[in-house]
Structure formats: structure tokens, C-alpha cells
């Protein structure tokens, strides 16, 4: 991939990721839904329970409510033509379900579609 193409694609991937981040900050799944492909996968443990499916994520975000002070950090963004992998660390989660301060480690896989970059998979670890 040419460096100029990589820079353009990097910006587009990060823009998609910010839809997810903004939805988390606002506690509003409608903000983040456009970032996800309609058939996206979602897996991880929320405490001792295995969480599966984007419907779990969207419901959780809406029920948790706003978490305006989260601190997201892109650990890595790897892009290969039409696929991307993003590792995201998010500190400072708060809200009715998260509690006072929780850290999340996320690994996302994105696919470049005709409509832009979309999250096709999210796996997470909740640090308690």
C-alpha cells in the first residue's frame, strides 16, 4: 500500500472508530451503530458472563448511560488493503453498569465496504 493511500485509509479507519467512541461517551448506541456492519460479531466477558452479539453491546451502552470522561488510546492500527485491525484501550469508563472507573481492552477487525470502513468484529476484555 502506498504511503499516501495508507494515510487516507488510516484517517478513515480512525473516523469509524470515533463513531464507536462517541457512542460510548454519550451512552447512545444510535451514535455508534453506523460504525458496525449489520452482521458484525461481538464477544467478551462482562464480569463472569460471556457477552455475545452486538445487541448486547448496544443495550449495554444505552443502559450504562453517558461516560463522558473515558480516555481512549489507539495501541495499534494495522491496515492491509481492505481489512484493518485496531487495538483500543479505554480507561475511565463510568455509568450505572460500569461502576466508578473501569478499563476495557478491545480488539476490532474492520472491513472496507462500498460504504466505507465498518467494524465486523469486536472482542473485549473488561479489567475489573
Predicted features, each with a name:
Residues 33, 43-45, 120-121:
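Short, hydrophobic secondary-structure boundary micro-motifs
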